[in-house]
């Protein structure tokens, strides 16, 4: 499945939020949209539709989800009682690639997605190579025993980096075992900050 592999700095500046750590660093240095005239350039006022589109794109790029898949997640969120926007972000948080990232097994969601697709991750002991898999309470996410011998994972444990990692409250991390458990459902406030989900709801409600 195709993924955006372009310059994260340019996208981060266009969206006004760092979609990766690298994007955050670039945005801190150049906190204005890309363009040859720099920060002093006068730009057209963005329409309501433009703001809604921008917010949807922001969430998509942060979580690394393609348009068609993002639309399916939104439609699934609509079936839940309560606030659709909040459930949209909760469903994005429950993606397996995001959980691998939140547990500290990867430094970016793109890397986490790669670990999943390459077969390094198990769910309840079974190899799962689908990044969009939705985790449930009680499930254990771990690095495959065969993969733990790889230098990347050995360094992750031996360097102490994983032991220092702070997983969110809805996940319980076991650094020594390269595993984690889903102990609760994520809440709206557990999602990535800086996303106005109501604008996304308005975009799809046009």
Curated annotation (Swiss-Prot):
Residues annotated as transmembrane: none
Molecular-function GO term, any one: rRNA binding
Domain of life according to the entry: Bacteria
One BP annotation, GO: translation
Keywords linked to the UniProt accession: Ribonucleoprotein, Ribosomal protein, RNA-binding, rRNA-binding
Domain S4 RNA-binding: 94-156
Pfam families per record: Ribosomal_S4, S4
CDD domains: S4
Entry-linked InterPro entries: Ribosomal_uS4, Ribosomal_uS4_bac-type, Ribosomal_uS4_CS, Ribosomal_uS4_N, S4_RNA-bd, S4_RNA-bd_sf
GO CC annotation terms, alphabetical: small ribosomal subunit
SUBUNIT field: Part of the 30S ribosomal subunit. Contacts protein S5. The interaction surface between S4 and S5 is involved in control of translational fidelity.
Function: One of the primary rRNA binding proteins, it binds directly to 16S rRNA where it nucleates assembly of the body of the 30S subunit. With S5 and S12 plays an important role in translational accuracy.
HAMAP family to which the protein is assigned, alphabetical: Ribosomal_uS4_B
Family: Belongs to the universal ribosomal protein uS4 family.
Protein name in the entry: Small ribosomal subunit protein uS4
Organism: Roseiflexus castenholzii (strain DSM 13941 / HLO8)
Organism lineage string: Bacteria, Bacillati, Chloroflexota, Chloroflexia, Chloroflexales
GN (gene name): rpsD
């Amino acid at each position: 499945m195709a993924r955006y592999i372009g310059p994260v700095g340019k996208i981060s500046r266009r969206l006004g939020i760092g979609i990766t750590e690298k994007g955050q660093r670039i945005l801190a240095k150049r906190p204005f949209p890309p363009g040859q005239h720099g920060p002093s350039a006068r730009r057209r006022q963005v329409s309501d539709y433009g703001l809604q589109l921008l917010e949807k794109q922001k969430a998509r790029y942060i979580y690394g989800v393609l348009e068609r898949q993002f639309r399916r997640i939104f439609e699934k969120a609509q079936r839940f009682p309560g606030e659709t926007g909040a459930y949209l972000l909760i469903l994005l948080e429950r993606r397996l690639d995001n959980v691998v990232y939140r547990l500290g097994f990867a430094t970016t969601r793109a890397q986490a997605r790669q670990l999943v697709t390459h077969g390094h991750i198990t769910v309840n002991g079974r190899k799962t190579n689908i990044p969009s898999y939705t985790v449930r309470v009680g499930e254990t996410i771990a690095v495959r025993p065969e993969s733990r011998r790889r230098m990347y994972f050995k360094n992750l444990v031996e360097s102490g980096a994983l032991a220092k990692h702070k997983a969110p409250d809805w996940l319980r991390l076991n650094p020594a075992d390269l595993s984690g458990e889903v102990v609760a459902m994520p809440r709206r406030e557990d999602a990535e900050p800086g996303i106005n989900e109501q604008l996304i709801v308005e975009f799809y409600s046009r």
